[in-house]
Structure formats: structure tokens, C-alpha cells
């Protein structure tokens, strides 16, 4: 797949040239293939939110370049509005941005500003509402009468209705209960699968990143510390912990097993993968194979009796 995002040596300074100047991004370079689902993680202040606001031109690089679909984002500043239809950005607590009289009008706001005809707008509103699991009976109600989770759905649907080729979400499940969190993120994943939209998801939840993303970008001290597949990034758990981050709970369990000398992989990061790995280990043991990790294996600390 071709790269839909290419970032070259991006740096960004707040208040440049002033005594209170602050570097928010420092020489950041990476690419994203079209159709990828990239999780972005990092400690508070690492540069995550500043990075994603560059993806649709809300911030202009102090230095470096950003290419969206092969085009320099800032080559023609007067055309920056066109890129904002290509890259949809959902901020934290997007329901605070709701303002229209009805949910329908709020979802239709973006498509209307794209200059689409009424039939296409109506089609997009209903499609987006369906993607986020919003009951059509709610479309004519005021968004301010809805629950927090329903408001969040309206806000996300408003971005989806513009059919961006890139969907960027900054903690879209923040503040929701576990059930609401799973519903929102599952709907985003389903949207990604059905439309092929490239997704960038900022999250503090390692479980969410492990479950939904196929690649992970790790920010630390305004730079990219890691950028690889989910498997390879979470296999580097000790390095993530050194950066002040965590790993999925199931990964911690398997790392502990390796510390105890049990021969299991270090890159187990989801429950289904854990179940598959445990069943495979049981089959090996039932076949008479030892599950003792060799002493010279990475993270190994000798054997365990009874394995």
C-alpha cells in the first residue's frame, strides 16, 4: 500500500523567539500506509496531541514537511481547507463541540460545508449514525438532551459523515465507562474495516491499542521512540516501562512467566492471543516437551520445576 501520510523532520515550537518558547516536537519523521490503524502512545507532554493537530493543518510546522496523499500540506496555504476534508480530527471530549439544534443538523454540518447536495448529505448523515450505533429516532432530538455516550457518538458521526480518508482520534473514549468505551472503539474499528479509512488513535490505554491497532507509534520527550507493529512494540516491554509507559496486563503476566523461566513468547498482548499461546504450551507439555526457558534466552532466569 502507498503511504498516505509522510512526515519529514517535523519540529514545532510554541511561541518561537520568545522567552517562553517551548519545543513540542523535535525532528519527527514517520510514514503511514493507507488503510493502517496506528495507535499513538506516550507520557503526558510527550507531543502526541501536538503531532496529530499537524495532520490537518491546525498547526503549521516550525520546520519540516508533512505530505498527505503525496501532496505537501503547506505548499499552497490557501488550499489548506481541502486537506481538512481529507483528514478528520476528533478531539478529546468532542461532545463539547456540539452546537446545532438537532443531532441531524450537527452531523450534517461538515458535509454541508463541503458543498454536497441535500440527497448526499442525508445519505451520509444516516450512514454515519449507523456506523456509531446512533438510533435514527434520536436524529431529530437536541444533542444536549442525550447521555454523554450518545453525545460522543453524534460528535464522531459528524466527522465520519465527511468521509475523510484519514480519521484522527484523540482519546475518543475518555471519560466513558468501560462498556461505552468498548462500544465507541469497536464502532471505530468496524468503520475502519468497512471503509478502509486510515486511522490514527491516541490513547493512554495499552489494552485499547493492543486490541485495535496494527502499528504503534511511541512518543517520548518530543521525539519518536518506537514505531513498529503491535507485536514488536509490546515485545519491548522493559523499554516501554523505562519511558514511563505501561503494557497490557496480559503482556505483564507473560513477561512474569518468562522471568520465572517458563518458555512462552514475550509479545503476547491480547486475551485471544494469550489463550492460543496457553493452549499451544499445554499441547507441548502433553507431548512431553519441556517448557523450561533456556538459561541464555532473553529475560530468562533459569528453569521451573514441574514444567
Model regions: which residues?
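ABC ATPase NBD Q-loop/coupling interface
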Residues: 65-82
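Catalytic Walker B motif of ABC-type/P-loop ATPase nucleotide-binding domains
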Residues: 167-170
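Conserved ABC ATPase "signature" C-loop
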Residues: 221-222
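Conserved ABC ATPase signature
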Residues: 142-146, 150
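Conserved catalytic motifs of ABC-family nucleotide-binding domains
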Residues: 163
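Conserved ABC ATPase "signature" region
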Residues: 119-137
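Helix-to-loop junction immediately C-terminal to a conserved catalytic motif
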Residues: 56
